[in-house]
C-alpha cells in the first residue's frame, strides 16, 4: 500500500518580515528539515509544493541529497490561498497512492518516525483521517487523508484546508500522539526566536 507525502511550502510568510522557509536552523533552512523528515518516512513519492520565492527555494533544495527523490512542484496560484497548494499536491500523486500525509514546511522538529506512525495507524485501521495530536489531545500536524477524501480536498477554496473535514468527523478520526515540542510550527518572528532559544542558538 503506497502513501504519498506532501510538504506544503508555497505560503507568503505574511506574518513575518522575511521568507521564513529559508531561515537558518541547525545549519540548514527551515524547509530542509520538513522535507528531510518526509523523505525519510515510509511515504512515496514525496512532493514539495512551492509558490512564493520558488526559484530561490528550488535552487537551494537541489543542492541537497535526500533519502529519496523529492518532486518540486510550483503552485502558480499560491496567492489564492492554501487550498490551491493542497490541490497541486494531490494532482502530483500517482493513482497508486491510497492516501497522503500533508505537512507544512515550517515544522523543523518533526521526525520521520512521527510521519511513519501515522502511516502505520492508517495501514492498521484503514481510517480515512489520521491526525497528529499533542499529549493534551490538541490537533496538530501532520495529517493523513485517504484517497477517498481527495475529491473533497481538491474542492477546497481560498485558505481552506482539511480542517473542516477533520472537525466534522473528529470522534472517528484516528489520533497519533506526538510530543508537543515536535509539532511546533514557525509562523511568526517570535516563534522563530523561541525555536532558536530552545536550541541555545543566538
Where in the sequence are the language-model features?
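Conserved alpha/beta core of the MobA/IspD/sugar-nucleotide pyrophosphorylase nucleotidyltransferase superfamily
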Residues: 1-2, 151-202
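Nucleotide and nucleotide-moiety/phosphate-recognizing core
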Residues: 2-105, 109-139, 171-178
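Nucleotide phosphate-binding site architecture
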Residues: 13, 23, 150-151, 193
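A broad detector of the eukaryotic-type serine/threonine protein kinase catalytic domain
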Residues: 43, 149-150
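Short glycine- and hydrophobic/aromatic-rich loop-to-beta-strand nucleating segment
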Residues: 141-145, 184
Amino acid at each position: 500500500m503506497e502513501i504519498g507525502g506532501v510538504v506544503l511550502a508555497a505560503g507568503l510568510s505574511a506574518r513575518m518580515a522575511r521568507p521564513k522557509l529559508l531561515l537558518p536552523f541547525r545549519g540548514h533552512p527551515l524547509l530542509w528539515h520538513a522535507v528531510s523528515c518526509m523523505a525519510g518516512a515510509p511515504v512515496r513519492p514525496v512532493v514539495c509544493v512551492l509558490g512564493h520565492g520558488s526559484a530561490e527555494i528550488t535552487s537551494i533544495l537541489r543542492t541537497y541529497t535526500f533519502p529519496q527523490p523529492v518532486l518540486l512542484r510550483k503552485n502558480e496560484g499560491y496567492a489564492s490561498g492554501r487550498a490551491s497548494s493542497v490541490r497541486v499536491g494531490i494532482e502530483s500523486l500517482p493513482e497508486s497512492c491510497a492516501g497522503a500525509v500533508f505537512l507544512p514546511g515550517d515544522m523543523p522538529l518533526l521526525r520521520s518516525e512521527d510521519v511513519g506512525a501515522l502511516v502505520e495507524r492508517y495501514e492498521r485501521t484503514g481510517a480515512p483521517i489520521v491526525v497528529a495530536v499533542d499529549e493534551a489531545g490538541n490537533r496538530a500536524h501532520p495529517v493523513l487523508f485517504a484517497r477517498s477524501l481527495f475529491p473533497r480536498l481538491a474542492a477546497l477554496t481560498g485558505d481552506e484546508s482539511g480542517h473542516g473535514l477533520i472537525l466534522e468527523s473528529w470522534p472517528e478520526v484516528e489520533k497519533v500522539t506526538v510530543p508537543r515540542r515536535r509539532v511546533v510550527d514557525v509562523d511568526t518572528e517570535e516563534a522563530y526566536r523561541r525555536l532558536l532559544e530552545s536550541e541555545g542558538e543566538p
